Amino acid sequence: MTSYAKLSLFSPAKINLFLHITGKRADGYHNLQTVFRLLDWGDTLEFLVTQDSFDPTAPINEQHLLVRLSSTVAITAQVMDNLVIKAAVALLQAWQNSALTRSSDPAVTPHLPVIEVTLNKVLPTGAGLGGGSSNAATTLIALNKLWGFHYDIEALIKIGATVGADVPIFVLGQDAIAEGIGERLTPIKLPQHQYLLLNPAAHAATQALFAHPDLQRNVPALSIDEIKAAQSCYLQQLNAPFSNVFEPVVTKLVPEVNQALNYLRQLEALTGTQARMTGTGSSVFLPIPTDKISLITHHLSNAGAPCDYVLTQSLDKNGQNPE
């Protein structure tokens, strides 16, 4: 067991500075290349050890209560589909599948406490900001401590990849180049930046986007060294060979995203930077130089924006890495 009784952890958003599909895999998934950037804007999760307990060796099913989840927004109708619950189940399954861990770890007791989880939701869903994946990663990190499993970050990343393709970056907790389906991560040092994010209240289904005939699926893969050396092409600008291959498809299918992106493009003359979409949408963002923040703030206060927006900055710390 552990001495932790309660944890409160930040669950950040991410943006994709670019997003390429480099080919289709034998398993039906697509290989991607992207640079993930974590933001100082996100949800908060509170984890409380309760007096209730469960047998961690028992089979896991819907009646196997590992955590009690409450949220400031509506939770998935089928609770087992919630990524917080999926993360808890994946962590326990990994422990159950490791006889070595069970036999050699004196910190693990015959019974583990049920954890009460409160999700204070800020991030919009279906926005390409990774909110659900971030919540799942934060849950893995918290329960790893509270249940005394002592998995290292590499192990948690592997477990996270079974929950969702974007979960590993949030377990890593820092900006990174991602390859594969998002699970192969190479940390990258990027300068601090501010961003204006617009969050339209509409989005296209990810499955439909991957199936769309106009989606570019064969962008030539770049080496890690090439991506690191070309930061000036995707940090404040988005120049060839970098792009978000989903952006032209989403802007055709979702007028609200196109409207938000056009709004940001009108500000490019003020900022000298380039707007783009994150992930598969629907959020779009514009890098804002420090000396332009007051100008953009003044513009927003006078002219407003076509949808919800937030001014934020890149996360300047290592995030949620486990101890």
Swiss-Prot record:
Question: Which keywords appear in this protein's UniProt record, sorted alphabetically?
Answer: ATP-binding, Isoprene biosynthesis, Kinase, Nucleotide-binding, Transferase
The record's active-site residues are 14, 166
Which organism does this record belong to?
Answer: Psychrobacter sp. (strain PRwf-1)
* The keyword Transferase appears for this protein: yes
Gene encoding the protein: ispE
The keyword ATP-binding belongs to this UniProt entry's keyword annotation: yes
Q: Recorded E.C. number(s)?
A: 2.7.1.148
Q: Which GO terms describe its molecular function?
A: 4-(cytidine 5'-diphospho)-2-C-methyl-D-erythritol kinase activity; ATP binding
Q: Which HAMAP family match?
A: IspE
According to UniProt, the name of this protein is 4-diphosphocytidyl-2-C-methyl-D-erythritol kinase
Q: Name the PANTHER family for this protein.
A: 4-DIPHOSPHOCYTIDYL-2-C-METHYL-D-ERYTHRITOL KINASE, CHLOROPLASTIC
Give the pathway: Isoprenoid biosynthesis; isopentenyl diphosphate biosynthesis via DXP pathway; isopentenyl diphosphate from 1-deoxy-D-xylulose 5-phosphate: step 3/6
* Cysteine disulfide links: none
